Amino acid sequence: MTATEVKAKILSLLDEVAQGEEIEITKHGRTVARLVAATGPHALKGRFSGVAMAAADDDELFTTGVSWNVS
């Protein structure tokens, strides 16, 4: 598929990629990129937000228990 075709059809191509398709993009007859579904740690970024909770609040986690006199 040419870069021009990709530009015109990007939203439908993203749907195809989400279904497992792999799309090769060409420019001047040469393959310059492949459009594939995201995998790995970056693909999951934000997916689990709000699922886990801390057992303590920030004050409990980050206090040293020592009072500091800053004057």
From Swiss-Prot:
Pfam families given in the database record: PhdYeFM_antitox
Transmembrane regions listed in the UniProt entry: none
InterPro entries in alphabetical order: Antitoxin_Phd/YefM, phD-YefM_TA_antitoxins, YefM-like_sf
Domain of life: Bacteria
BP GO terms, sorted: positive regulation of translation
Keywords annotated in UniProt: Toxin-antitoxin system
Function: Antitoxin component of a type II toxin-antitoxin (TA) system. Upon expression in M.smegmatis neutralizes the effect of cognate toxin VapC22.
PANTHER family membership: ANTITOXIN VAPB22 (PTHR35377:SF8), ANTITOXIN VAPB49-RELATED-RELATED (PTHR35377)
Family as reported in the entry's similarity comment: Belongs to the phD/YefM antitoxin family.
Cross-referenced NCBIfam families: phd_fam
Name assigned to this protein: Antitoxin VapB22
Species whose genome carries this gene: Mycobacterium tuberculosis (strain ATCC 25618 / H37Rv)
